[in-house]
Amino acid sequence: MSRTSNRESLAALTLGAMGVVYGDIGTSPLYTMKEVFSPATGVPLDGVHLIGAVSVIFWGLMMVVTLKYVLLILRADNRGEGGIMALTALAANAAGKTARRRTVLLLMGVFGAALFYGDSVITPAISVLSAVEGLEVVTPAFKSYVLPISVTVLIGLFAVQRFGTSLVGKLFGPVIMLWFAVLSVTGVAEIIQQPAILAALNPLNAFEFLRSQGWHMFVAVGAIVLAFTGVEALYADMGHFGKRPIQLAWLGLVLPALAINYMGQGALLMRDPSALANPFYRLFPQAWLMPAVVLATLATVIASQAVISGAYSMTKQAVLLGLLPRMQVQYTSAKEIGQIYMPEVNWLLLISVLLAVVGFGSSSALASAYGIAVTMTMLITTALTFFVVRDGWGYPLPVALAATAVFLALDTLLVVSCSLKFFQGGWFPLVLGLVIFTVMATWRRGRELLIDNIRHDDPELLPFITALSADVVHRVPRTAVYTVANPDTVPQALMHNLKHNQVLHERNVILTVVFHDVPWIAFDERVQVKPLVPGFWKVQVNYGFKNAPDIPRALELCQSQGLSINLFETSYFLSREIVVPTKGAGMAHWREALFAIMSRNAGSVADFFRLPNNCVIELGTRVQI
């Protein structure tokens, strides 16, 4: 590829990263400064404290985003992929020398993933509300319309998800680029009028601000953390855009624009303290307010879209890793496999977001709910990164501590500060995360118990089919594919077929699908074929947690290993377990009941593995756990 085309590709990816990766953190100026100096924090609104607060925001962006994420954590990729799931797999594989340590690391990662859903609810709610609240600055008469308009925008956003984002997605980058340009221009205009705010670039002013607050510092930091929300997207979307475009976008445009706008708002408040009612929109001349509201609403919708898409991707990964039951996945783009739509996730998210909007009623009230889930995820990310640096990259313990200790201390400060807002709304995303964590843990444990029971009750495969080949059993043409969780025991569907139909197919494939804790499995590693006895083969299909399962396509790959399967003459036999909860088993009875409900409502195996419906025979089996 030529140097020119390389530059063009890098520019396109950098522009795309602006639209998807930086939408959330890029819309934080809408509400952060207003919350830092709200009556709830008790921070005086004067020049010294304005310079100090802006200094904390600026150096927080430098420490949390630039040093921690852009320079350190983006290096911890799992075969090019990022995100809490990929990092968890990386840390668990590197540091999981004992089963106990591996389990602890996996639980940390799963809890961090569960907390992400709390962020997925709060981000669209607070972003859209804060943008539409700009109408109140245009005229107070619009105040009563803010909530209905916000609800309408959110319903519209979730309603169009099933059509995909391939068309409007091309506009995300340019719109967000315009947004950051506007942030810069409006900020510079105020800085010129009040250049004293540039003292915020001195880190000593940040330390002095925190020192002067005493124990009250935690309350102030709990509001300042709003400037860092959305930072996890830098790492989560690394697989889509690559490390370099994300770094270039941050250092080249996003960081300067955010720093300039926060200093601009600080300069405005130094000059006119009455602007605290909505310092972001007061940066604009009256004639530009309506266009500013429209642009802000577009930017927040884009930020929300990125979080919603992230929720789909996270859920799909959790399903493939065995943390959630199967769900319907619709691919909305013929070109981009990462563009998916999950109806159940979409509507559950919409209901949760609307409850948050109506329940809290304003962006200021929602600001209290924002932060706990985000900062706890940041803390978990740093802790997992320590194990990657120490055990994955092989650095000595002092080096690993030097690379992560400061960030661990900083993240702990942010978590403690946000915890003070627990009773003001911080409980909402935390409870949501705990519920999802419980669901994930219950599903994982339930599947383990289910497979153990099946393994205990069913006969071993090889002796069974060896004896079967010696019997005179009526054989019918075609190939039968039996999907099983445990490849060493006889499939329930095979025993049902023999018992009720008293026939055996000429060719029988015992198929096991294994999902590995790596993002991708290449085609040359996708299938493993093992002949058993005449007429029987064992096939293992391997997928990563970002692959799209497609069994018919995988079976075509068996030909390279000596097994030719005519897909037009193949029947797929599936066993559907009907779970019966019993007291005194491996889980609390309420968890067994929850698992039974999830198992009963899990998505179709045929749809999940893309099996042709007219070639599928599904047989039910009652299993006690």
UniProtKB/Swiss-Prot annotation:
It is a multi-pass membrane protein. One of its GO terms (cellular component) is plasma membrane. The keyword Ion transport applies. It catalyses: K(+)(in) + H(+)(in) = K(+)(out) + H(+)(out). The chain crosses the membrane at residues 10-30, 47-67, 104-124, 140-160, 172-192, 214-234, 250-270, 283-303, 347-367, 369-389, 396-416, 422-442. It is found in: Cell inner membrane. GO terms for molecular function: potassium ion transmembrane transporter activity; symporter activity. InterPro entries: K+_transporter, K_trans_C, K_trans_N, Kup. It holds the Pfam family K_trans_C. Keywords: Cell inner membrane, Cell membrane, Ion transport, Membrane, Potassium, Potassium transport, Symport, Transmembrane, Transmembrane helix, Transport. Belongs to the HAK/KUP transporter (TC 2.A.72) family. HAMAP family: Kup. Transport of potassium into the cell. Likely operates as a K(+):H(+) symporter. This is Probable potassium transport system protein Kup 2. It comes from Albidiferax ferrireducens (strain ATCC BAA-621 / DSM 15236 / T118). The lineage of its organism: Bacteria, Pseudomonadati, Pseudomonadota, Betaproteobacteria, Burkholderiales.
